[in-house]
Amino acid sequence: IFFQKKIKKIIPTEKISEVQKTLGEKVNSAKVGDLLVLDNIYFKNRSPIIVPTSRAVLYDLLCALEDNPNLKIQIQGHICCQLVSDYEDISTRRARAVYVFLVQNKINRKRLSYKGFGVSKPIHPIPEKTEAEANENRRVEIMIVEN
């Protein structure tokens, strides 16, 4: 049996707006075809379930989409660590989890698409040499389709 300790972290309002502003600025200055890595989105191991600590990043993306009504994106999922194909299609399921979050929060699905790339587009060669490299390969990106 595993127990989880809930830790409440209070983030000052001005810090939250800085994070949102940063993502919003990235989106505003992005051109069609640009890729933006969504840092700090984590999933349960071999699962499309987003861990609760990742919610802040999802809400930042939601705000960026609400602030840019003409913005259309493709959500791209990537996995790490395996040279074999993504047999469980986890990368697609993770990208879809982000898509579902946005649709459930009233973003028009016509503005969104999603795709999984498995291990086909790593940042670092596989197998990774460090956990940091694995974390960078295990990511969600958004590609600007229209802005």
Description of each model-found segment:
Residues 49, 53, 78-147:
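Periplasmic OmpA-like peptidoglycan-binding domain that tethers envelope proteins to the cell wall
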Residues 1-72, 131, 146-147:
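Periplasmic peptidoglycan-binding/tethering modules of Gram-negative envelope proteins
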